[in-house]
Amino acid sequence: MKRSRNRSAMPEVSAARRRFLAGSVAATATVSFAKQLGAQTGNGSLRMYSWPDYTGSSTLADFTASSGISVSADFYDSSDEMLRTISGADHRYDIIIASYDYVEEMIGKELLLLLDHSQIPNIANLYPVFNDAIFDPGRRYSMPFLWGTQGICFRRSALSAIPESWGILLDSDAYSGRIALPGPDTLGLALKYLGYSYNSVDPGELEAAGALLIRQKSHVKAFVGPEGIELLANGDVDLAVGWNSEVHRLMEEDDDIGYRVPTEGGLLWQDCFCIPRSASNPSGAHRLIDYALDAEMGAAIAEYLWYATPNRAAVALLSQDYREDHTIFPGMEIIKRCEPALNLGEAGTRLRDQIWQRVSEA
């Protein structure tokens, strides 16, 4: 299947944020998340495929202790590498953690097994907003593991107030020459600002978004993709667009940096558990997914990695610092206005490319 993906920087950013995560986890003292779920024992083993260091320090060992199922984990460095592997006939993996946009593609390629929700009772712990997904209606093939957002990154000392709308970037001259925007993905942000879907392929809506960006272009210092965060860090701009996980790292180094998801909403990424269609131990894979969705285990993983969990029962157990960190949790009303970047199809991608070319040439 030819890929006509919405050209979000998400796959590359995902890899970058996990590379940072791998380094930070290695530097963190080991924490035990042991949780006994009762006398559940079983035979067999699981092979897991995920980003490096993307569970708690003892999550898999604790699962083995409670279930009797041993788990071996292999790691990939990019989502494209993962997709190539799972597309092969001899990968032998039973469970994977994958970015939502690749979940959508694997569903289309019939690479994933239908989940049996009766084997995942802890699905009841999820926030209702995560019980369904536009890229996987009914959660038939995926369960959410961790999530995050894209929003406005800003230098606090340069702004008179915390930005609450994409308009400060897209429809204002207040910070002329001090704005960095993420290239073609800016079309989606303009659509959100105008009240449309980030994934719209409606010609009239795209024309309006393009016209907005052409008017704003003279006030933008650079269209640079994820490098906008570096410009912000270096003091070259005061406003940029970034993923919350990367901005959180920057905020730890510079307390003058802030982050806000606008009231119009933004992009929401998810990483999900899936079971490959060729899995040899789907029952064990279901048990591991359910284990990760347990309230105490979900809380331990989320606080260890400092990423947002879709697990409402887990959030209730987390520290106040975590729960009140708006870089992680922008608020449920804002989350409801966020959406993932989807595959737009060849015609939709071609139309958006044409609109963006006009913006670039203006």
Where are these regions (language model features)?
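A bilobed periplasmic-binding-protein/Venus flytrap-type ligand-binding module shared by bacterial periplasmic
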Residues: 151-158, 193-195, 269-284, 289, ...
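N-terminal secretory signal peptides
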Residues: 1-16
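Periplasmic-binding protein-like
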Residues: 148, 206-215, 251-277
